[in-house]
Swiss-Prot record:
This is Large ribosomal subunit protein eL33. NCBIfam families: PRK04337.1. Pfam families: Ribosomal_L35Ae. HAMAP family: Ribosomal_eL33. One of its GO terms (cellular component) is ribosome. GO terms for biological process: translation. Belongs to the eukaryotic ribosomal protein eL33 family.
């Protein structure tokens, strides 16, 4: 089952930004319980040039269904607001 998701932000604090960990909101997932079923799944972002950057969902973020995904390499800023595919 493939799910689309939106890249919301980098994982960050007031002074630090972790560019290889992204906060992703899967579409039609609205609770922490539904999001926890996605842990361990593969996340793929396709760049405008056609490269595929792969990551893995590592944990839930918050109570509204967002998740954290750790990528092999950091995603560029142009990925923010873009769609990813959760496999």
């Amino acid at each position: 089952m493939r799910i689309k998701g939106v890249v919301l932000s980098y994982r960050r604090s007031k002074e630090n930004q972790h560019t290889n960990v992204m906060i992703i909101k899967p579409l039609n997932v609205n609770s922490r319980e539904e999001a926890s079923k996605l842990i361990g799944r593969l996340v793929i972002w396709k760049s405008p040039s056609g490269k595929l950057l792969k990551g893995k969902i590592v944990r839930v973020h918050g109570t509204k269904g967002a998740v954290r995904a750790r990528f092999e390499k950091g995603l560029p800023g142009q990925a923010l607001g873009d769609y990813v595919e959760i496999i």
